[in-house]
């Protein structure tokens, strides 16, 4: 089923709603239905499973709230054919489950339910809701509240609901209707396993509804939800080529990375709005720039703006409190600016949001639709802007999103020549005041590079084309950190030793927190002492190594001398041997001569003597 945007009166609805529901709709100020409500309510209130895809801000929440309350009213209030009152709900049983990917959206859905439930007549039993999200309370406390309060509708995030259903005190046999809001997100890899486990615990005869602005991205996974012959309802804008509602204008802006924050400040100052949502890529970047804006922008502008910070690293209570303050704050007194991540991208319905700014495109193109859809809701005019880096392939993102059904117009970057240099000087001074600020800036910078590398449109968002130096200046870095991606910086653009400005002595760069600074100095002294000690040890080791080397040389010299003496001794012995052989021959000759002479002597000769002395 395919419908176009438009409005219809509730009187033409092909479904006989309970009188109290009609009264609630009228009292809450909904004089007409939106197309998605007119198409969905009759089918989902009956016996049809539905898969609903409609542009953001088209009224999808009410399109499932009314069918859920209609079914529960039939179960709790209708007298059967025999005139008997309906059977009461057993302890530990619930009648409906609503799943949401985020705590903020779950809380918002509960708020819509509770507003309608205020109009239940006093003579009828109250229909009760319960919020199940992490960090608000323990699972044990949730179960105790459920059993005591006899809850009918559970509105939950998948992880907490799965823990909740693991209790033996909780039964799912009576569930009649289940809803997956932002179903494409619930059926992606991050939630799919938990969601399928939950749905398998529910009765097969239940009714199931899937709702999202981009449900088609869920693909074949929807068939694993246990739906029986679901009806697909697609609600398009009047301009069927554009997935955005006609009240929403989406633009792109080419900006140098270095000047991106200056451009953002210029937009916040010059654009007329009551509430603005600015999307950052990571939680650390939200924390970093929230502090920057609170310190620099508000001081200069005398608190003309009220900044809010919302991200996934906040616990549940602060997140919900921040969202409430941003939603209910007096935007006529101060311009309200919410700095956030994709935690506030889906389903959040905040009144009077006129402007949405995306500092960088999201890694998932489907999220682009959801981010942009936080403004231009309920036929109110809204402006969404995405910043694209100059001198990169990011300009191809415009054509990429057009293929996805999102048409964007070009918007000129505001004139920032007067404010950029002034802001950069203040930014650097701000960074030098506290070492912790620089550490957070480095984490934000590194986190963004990781974020950039995970883009689904990897042919457009390439690490090789990223302006790392400009990006470092945008985050206020004093020096680029050493990381593998730095190899993509051309040699002629790489600052000397990574410094983005004047070189500073990092040993003297202090924390503003005195306790932290004392600890740093202590660690610094210990490091210096350790370095001196290590240097001394290395010197001793060197001397030791040299002594061993000298000893080895002596041993080798001695060995050589021994071999030389051996060779000399052998030479002498050989000479002696030669001399000994010659003497033997001489001795033999002499003996022969003596022998010969003896033979020549006569006897007279032997008796002859001299008598001269006589």
From Swiss-Prot:
Keywords: ATP-binding, Coiled coil, Helicase, Hydrolase, Nucleotide-binding, Nucleus, Ribosome biogenesis, RNA-binding, rRNA processing. One of its GO terms (cellular component) is nucleolus. GO terms for molecular function: ATP binding; ATP hydrolysis activity; RNA binding; RNA helicase activity. PROSITE patterns: DEAD_ATP_HELICASE (PS00039), HELICASE_ATP_BIND_1 (PS51192), HELICASE_CTER (PS51194), Q_MOTIF (PS51195). ATP-binding RNA helicase involved in the biogenesis of 60S ribosomal subunits. Binds 90S pre-ribosomal particles and dissociates from pre-60S ribosomal particles after processing of 27SB pre-rRNA. Required for the normal formation of 18S rRNA through the processing of pre-rRNAs at sites A0, A1 and A2, and the normal formation of 25S and 5.8S rRNAs through the processing of pre-rRNAs at sites C1 and C2. Belongs to the DEAD box helicase family. DDX55/SPB4 subfamily. This is ATP-dependent rRNA helicase SPB4. The lineage of its organism: Eukaryota, Fungi, Dikarya, Ascomycota, Saccharomycotina. The gene is SPB4.
């Amino acid at each position: 089923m395919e419908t176009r945007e438009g409005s219809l009166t509730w009187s033409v609805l092909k479904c006989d709603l309970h009188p109290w529901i009609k009264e609630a709709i009228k009292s809450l100020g909904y004089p007409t239905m939106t197309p998605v409500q007119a198409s969905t309510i009759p089918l989902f209130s009956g016996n049809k499973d539905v898969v609903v895809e409609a542009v953001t801000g088209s009224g999808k929440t009410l399109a499932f709230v009314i069918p859920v309350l209609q079914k529960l009213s039939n179960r709790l209030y209708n007298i059967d054919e025999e005139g008997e009152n309906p059977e009461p709900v057993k302890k530990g049983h619930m009648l409906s489950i609503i799943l949401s990917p985020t705590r903020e959206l779950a809380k918002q859905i509960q708020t819509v339910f509770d507003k309608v439930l205020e109009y239940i007549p006093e003579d009828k039993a109250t229909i009760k809701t319960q919020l199940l999200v992490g960090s608000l309370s323990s699972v044990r406390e949730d179960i105790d509240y459920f059993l005591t309060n006899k809850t009918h509708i559970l509105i939950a995030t998948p992880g907490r609901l799965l823990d909740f259903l693991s209790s033996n005190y909780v039964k799912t046999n009576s569930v009649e209707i289940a809803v997956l809001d932002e179903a494409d997100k619930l059926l992606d890899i991050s939630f799919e396993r938990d969601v399928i486990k939950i749905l398998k615990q529910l009765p097969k005869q239940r009714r199931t509804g899937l709702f999202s602005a981009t449900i088609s991205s869920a693909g074949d996974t929807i068939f694993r939800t246990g739906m029986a012959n679901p009806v697909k309802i697609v609600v398009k804008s009047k301009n069927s080529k554009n997935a955005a509602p006609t009240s929403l204008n989406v633009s792109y802006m080419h900006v140098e990375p270095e000047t991106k924050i200056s451009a953002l400040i210029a937009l916040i100052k010059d654009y007329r709005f009551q509430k603005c949502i600015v999307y950052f890529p990571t939680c650390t970047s939200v924390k970093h720039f929230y502090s920057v804006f609170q310190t620099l922008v508000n001081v200069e502008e005398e608190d003309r703006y009220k900044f809010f910070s919302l991200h996934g690293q906040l616990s549940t209570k602060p997140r919900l409190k921040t969202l409430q303050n941003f939603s209910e704050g007096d935007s006529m007194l101060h311009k309200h600016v919410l700095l956030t991540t994709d935690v506030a991208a889906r389903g959040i319905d905040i009144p009077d949001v006129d402007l949405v700014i995306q500092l960088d495109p999201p890694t998932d193109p489907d999220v682009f639709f959801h981010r942009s859809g936080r403004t231009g809701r309920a036929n109110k005019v809204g402006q969404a802007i995405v910043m694209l880096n100059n001198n990169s392939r990011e300009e191809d993102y415009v054509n990429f999103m057009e293929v996805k059904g999102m048409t964007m117009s070009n918007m000129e970057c505001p004139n920032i020549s007067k404010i950029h240099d002034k802001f950069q000087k203040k930014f650097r001074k701000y960074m030098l005041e506290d070492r912790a600020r620089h550490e957070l800036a480095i984490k934000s910078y590194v986190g963004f590079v990781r974020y950039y590398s995970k883009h689904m449109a990897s042919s457009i968002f390439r690490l090789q084309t990223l302006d790392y130096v400009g990006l470092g200046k945008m985050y206020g870095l004093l020096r680029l950190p050493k990381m593998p991606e730095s190899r993509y910086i051309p040699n002629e653009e790489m600052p000397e030793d990574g410094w983005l400005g004047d070189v500073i002595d990092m040993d003297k760069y202090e924390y503003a927190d005195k306790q932290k600074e004392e600890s740093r100095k202590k660690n610094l002294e210990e490091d210096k002492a350790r370095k001196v000690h290590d240097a001394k040890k290395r010197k001793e080791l060197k001397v030791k190594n040299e002594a061993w080397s000298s000893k080895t040389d002596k041993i080798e010299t001695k060995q050589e001398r021994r071999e030389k003496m051996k060779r000399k001794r052998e030479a002498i012995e050989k000479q002696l041997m030669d001399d000994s052989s010659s003497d033997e021959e001489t001795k033999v000759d002499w003996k022969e001569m003596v022998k010969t002479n003896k033979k020549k002597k006569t006897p007279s000769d032997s008796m002859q003597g001299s008598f001269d002395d006589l």
